[in-house]
Each structure stands twice: as C-alpha cells, then as structure tokens.
C-alpha cells in the first residue's frame, strides 16, 4: 500500500521542473495521484476498510487543493499536468 522509494524517485524524475526539484506542485500532485490509485485498488478488494477510505478522502482533498492553486497561478502548467496524469475525464 505504501509508495516505495524507487517508485517515488521515478515519479519525481518524470514530473520535476529542475534537477533538485522534489516539492513543486506538479511533483506533489503526481505523488498524491499515485498514492490515490494504490489506495483505490486496495479499497476495491477491502470494501469495509473505512480507515483507509478516510485516508483516501484526505489525499483526494489535498490533491484538489494543490490543483486549485496551480490552476489559479499558472493555467498552462495546470492543463499540461491534467493531460499527463489523465485526470478530469
């Protein structure tokens, strides 16, 4: 259920803006999206795991806030990120 170090490094490598970038909005959203996908798969199998469901809702809320911030500050980066992650329909 956790995101392994190698997976995390690969996601950071793919979405970073510059060489030392680990905390840009794009990287944070990509990491949250991966964690959300993992938890979603877990909940498909364990339908009554309500504690994990609450954690999933918190992650989705955090991702929503970050995406709202990115849309407000730089709409082009927002659109590019949505396309790359396959979010929003």
Curated annotation (Swiss-Prot):
GO cellular component entries: cytosolic small ribosomal subunit
Membrane spanning stretches: none
A molecular function (GO) term: rRNA binding
Matching SMART domains: Ribosomal_S15
Pfam family, one: Ribosomal_S15
Keyword rRNA-binding set for record: yes
Gene3D superfamilies in the cross-refs: 6.10.250.3130, S15/NS1, RNA-binding
UniProt keyword list: Ribonucleoprotein, Ribosomal protein, RNA-binding, rRNA-binding
InterPro entries, alphabetized: Ribosomal_uS15, Ribosomal_uS15_bac-type, uS15_NS1_RNA-bd_sf
Top-rank lineage group of the source organism: Bacteria
A biological-process GO annotation: translation
Function: One of the primary rRNA binding proteins, it binds directly to 16S rRNA where it helps nucleate assembly of the platform of the 30S subunit by binding and bridging several RNA helices of the 16S rRNA. Forms an intersubunit bridge (bridge B4) with the 23S rRNA of the 50S subunit in the ribosome.
NCBIfam families according to UniProt: S15_bact (TIGR00952)
PANTHER family linked to this entry: RIBOSOMAL PROTEIN S15, BACTERIAL AND ORGANELLAR, SMALL RIBOSOMAL SUBUNIT PROTEIN US15M
Self-association and partners: Part of the 30S ribosomal subunit. Forms a bridge to the 50S subunit in the 70S ribosome, contacting the 23S rRNA.
Homology family: Belongs to the universal ribosomal protein uS15 family.
Protein name per UniProt: Small ribosomal subunit protein uS15
Species this chain originates from: Thermomicrobium roseum (strain ATCC 27502 / DSM 5159 / P-2)
């Amino acid at each position: 259920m956790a995101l392994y170090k190698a997976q995390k490094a690969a996601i950071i490598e793919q979405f970073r803006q510059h060489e030392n970038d680990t905390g840009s909005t794009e990287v944070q959203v990509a990491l949250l999206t991966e964690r959300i996908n993992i938890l979603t798969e877990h909940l498909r199998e364990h339908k009554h795991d309500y504690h994990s469901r609450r954690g999933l809702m918190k992650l989705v809320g955090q991702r929503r806030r970050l995406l709202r911030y990115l849309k407000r500050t730089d709409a082009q980066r927002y659109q590019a990120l949505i396309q790359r992650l396959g979010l929003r329909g």
